[in-house]
Amino acid sequence: MSPDALTPHDPRVTHHYITIPSTSLTYHYLLANPDSASFPHPTATVLLLHGWPDLSLGWRYQVPFLLSLGLRVIIPDMLGYGLTSAPSSPSEYSLKNLSFHMTHIIRQVNPSGQPVLLGTHDWGAFLGWRLALYYPELIKGIFAFCIPYSPPETKVTSLEEHIERHPELGYQLQNARGEVEEAVNGGSKERLRGWLNAMFGGLAKEDGGVMAFDPWKGVDVAKLEEVGGSPLVSEEVMDFYVEEYSRNGIRGPMNWYRTREINLEDELPLAEKCENWQFQVPAMIVMVGHDPALPPELTDGMEKYFAKGLRKEVIPEASHWVLIHTPEEVNKLVGEFLQQFL
């Protein structure tokens, strides 16, 4: 039996907005507070960052569990997603900019300036590691899923060069070039639904039941309306995702894949400072056994960047969508890691 999960429009969360200073960007985030009878004061605050293509609801199985520990939980729709602004320019999506945006969400909820715990998945993990680099004073612990920390690089390389070295990430080129965006944004809601089903493990009906998403290639945009339902996402939740993605289309989420050179340029000064950098907070990285693009061995040697220790875990039976695929195992590991802060 799956653990308790948030539903779309769940009364346990409240909806909040913040306009980031010096920008025209508005973020939407969910805020959940623990039961005041059991926890008159939250034990700590957790910021959860989702990945691609997801929403704040991607953490639906974790939020009730975190509330049961007395934690206050903040879950933004990331830039380009849901009810958050979706600017057209890729430059708005740099990890440096996004880190700055997160500081304002943290400070709006936590005006005392107390550091928060950080939970991340996929692109949210890429961002989370950079947030902790740029603003270490705001973070007191990190648990990340599927994306290990990698230090800033001293050389700017293109996405094409990166994919030459890592062909298992070929889908990123398809995303960056706009092929999927053009097909989905210019099509029906059924095409959008097919794309989302493909991302969440749906099968290509006319291709012998193979996965509709291939990390080496991406998706066959001509067959999106033929993709079967996701085995991981209920019809109710998928309906919600389709409505949320219908609002602004998928250019915003795809823009995250157009920022490689922007991010590397931003991080050149960090690369010099971070040669011997170590995070000064406890951290945990959780990898999975069924994600061909992100194998567990990517964490090899990662320990040297963590002065307070790094816990490394693998959930062998899980796919990339570990938060919803194996929520019991996720919550168990998160609960064990967070005990030191409670």
From Swiss-Prot:
<feature type="site" description="Contributes to the formation of an oxyanion binding site for the epoxide oxygen of substrate">
    <location>
        <position position="171"/>
    </location>
</feature>
<feature type="site" description="Contributes to the formation of an oxyanion binding site for the epoxide oxygen of substrate">
    <location>
        <position position="257"/>
    </location>
</feature>
<dbReference type="Pfam" id="PF00561">
    <property type="entry name" value="Abhydrolase_1"/>
</dbReference>
<comment type="similarity">
    <text>Belongs to the AB hydrolase superfamily. Epoxide hydrolase family.</text>
</comment>
<dbReference type="GO" id="GO:0016787">
    <property type="term" value="F:hydrolase activity"/>
</dbReference>
<feature type="active site" description="Nucleophile">
    <location>
        <position position="122"/>
    </location>
</feature>
<dbReference type="InterPro" id="IPR000639">
    <property type="entry name" value="Epox_hydrolase-like"/>
</dbReference>
<dbReference type="InterPro" id="IPR029058">
    <property type="entry name" value="AB_hydrolase_fold"/>
</dbReference>
<feature type="domain" description="AB hydrolase-1">
    <location>
        <begin position="44"/>
        <end position="332"/>
    </location>
</feature>
<comment type="function">
    <text>Highly reducing polyketide synthase; part of the gene cluster that mediates the biosynthesis of sordarial, a salicylic aldehyde structurally related to the phytotoxin pyriculol. The most interesting aspect of this pathway is formation of an aromatic product from the highly reducing polyketide synthase srdA. SrdA synthesizes a reduced polyketide chain from one molecule of acetyl-CoA and five molecules of malonyl-CoA. The polyketide chain is then reductively released as an aldehyde.</text>
</comment>
<feature type="active site" description="Proton acceptor">
    <location>
        <position position="320"/>
    </location>
</feature>
<keyword id="KW-0378">Hydrolase</keyword>
<dbReference type="InterPro" id="IPR000073">
    <property type="entry name" value="AB_hydrolase_1"/>
</dbReference>
<protein>
    <recommendedName>
        <fullName>Epoxide hydrolase srdG</fullName>
        <ecNumber>3.3.2.-</ecNumber>
    </recommendedName>
</protein>
